[in-house]
């Protein structure tokens, strides 16, 4: 994952959607790159995608990134998601859908990825495919990919409904309720706003 932040709101809608999926994916992935955080701090605070609904949560995300150091954000990541044994907050869909890791939701996700011709590169991604960063990266591909048979609105809507809409709100709830979450609580609020925009867009297709 090597996404660059959308530093202007003048991007066309599909490019902006793909960029935001990529940025959220990378911000939830460890280790956070100092270069990405530096870009976030320099980003304009108007909404990176058309629509005022995203503007305030985006402004808050940029603001908290500017207010915290790289070390503070890294420490918060380790506190919430790292450590030995059970993390304080899980980043995996199976946990929210079944209460356990590596369960049926992950198996179904792998089947759906196989149908799309996608698979996890174990050399670059040690986490399982139901990690929030992985499913957001898949959505980025479905929005921005060049193969129209795979990267199209129908595939986006189907994958989103099955593997993001079903559990991402619960992850956002957990982060926003956690007393030690600051940067990631704000990221959760922006993520929630973004997926709400996506849900509305897909609903209009139905």
Q: What are these regions, as identified by a protein language model?
A:
Residues 1-206:
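Surface/interface-facing alpha-helical segments and adjacent flexible terminal/loop regions used
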């Amino acid at each position: 994952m090597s996404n660059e932040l959308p530093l202007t709101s003048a991007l066309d809608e599909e490019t902006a959607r793909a960029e935001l999926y990529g940025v959220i994916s990378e911000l939830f992935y460890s280790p956070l790159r100092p270069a990405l955080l530096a870009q976030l701090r320099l980003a304009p605070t108007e909404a990176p995608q058309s629509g005022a609904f995203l503007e305030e949560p985006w402004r808050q995300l940029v603001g908290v990134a500017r207010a915290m150091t790289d070390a503070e954000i890294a420490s918060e990541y380790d506190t919430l998601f790292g450590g030995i044994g059970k993390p304080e907050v899980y980043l995996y869909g199976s946990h929210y859908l079944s209460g356990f890791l590596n369960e049926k939701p992950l198996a179904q996700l792998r089947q759906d990825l196989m149908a799309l011709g996608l698979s996890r590169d174990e050399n670059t991604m040690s986490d399982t495919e139901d990690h929030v960063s992985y499913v957001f990266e898949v959505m980025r591909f479905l929005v921005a990919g060049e193969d129209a048979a795979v990267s199209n609105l129908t595939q986006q809507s189907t994958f989103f409904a099955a593997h993001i809409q079903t559990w991402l709100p619960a992850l956002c709830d957990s982060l926003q309720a956690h007393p030690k979450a600051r940067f990631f609580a704000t990221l959760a609020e922006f993520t929630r706003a973004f997926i709400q925009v996506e849900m509305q867009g897909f609903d209009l297709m139905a």
